[in-house]
Amino acid sequence: VADIHEKLAHIAMPPTMVLALAGPEIFSITFGQEWRQAGLFAQWMAPWGYLVLVTSPLSTLFSVLEKQFHEMLFQGLLLGTRLVALLLGAYLGDVMMAVALFSLGSAACYLVFLLWIIRASGNAWSASWTGTARALVWSGLSVSPLLVLYASPEDSFRWSVAFGLTGLMVASRYLILMKRAWQ
């Protein structure tokens, strides 16, 4: 489980970091300025998407261990968390708050779910965090052009260059990962 988790972390981390760092810019450059808010939504949803991607393939462990009741409890917790988030966002009349609460609540549930899977599989938590940390470092290096861009004034040309460099670095990282997987 820890090995699969690490591979999934290496796959999911770069796009998550790109969205978390530059979601509004990606959406506004790609679709126009009126889509900027969708990029803000994507920023809030990035951690949740990451955790779903690295956790969902491991969820078959519930069936293997015949712990379907635990999966039902997880789904109930997830449903309750999401309902509370949406109701609170509606009560406050703030769409962004609703999306943020929904996403952060879902991410928290999936994090607990991931910790349960790691524990149930007999793996040490440190093994999975080590893999996540490695993925974070490599992804941080891959998206470093976007990080550098935040230190300079906004300019659409610079954003384009940063996105291009980031795309090349992420693609290079994926090629290295695929080469290792096929050896």
Segments the model singles out, each with a brief description of its role:
Residues 24, 33-36, 96, 126-130, ...:
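Generic alpha-helical secondary structure signal
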Residues 4-7, 13, 17, 49-57, ...:
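Hydrophobic alpha-helical transmembrane bundles that constitute the permease/transmembrane domains
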Residues 16-24, 29, 41-44, 83, ...:
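Membrane-embedded alpha-helical segments of multi-pass transporters/permeases
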Residues 39, 69, 76-111, 118-123, ...:
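Membrane-interface helix-loop junctions in multi-pass transport and translocation proteins
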Residues 120-136, 144-183:
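Membrane-proximal transmembrane or re-entrant/amphipathic helices at the cytosolic face
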Residues 1-76:
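Specific pore-lining/lateral-gate transmembrane helices of multi-pass inner-membrane transport
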Residues 7, 41-44, 58-66, 98, 115-130, 132, ...:
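Alpha-helical transmembrane segments
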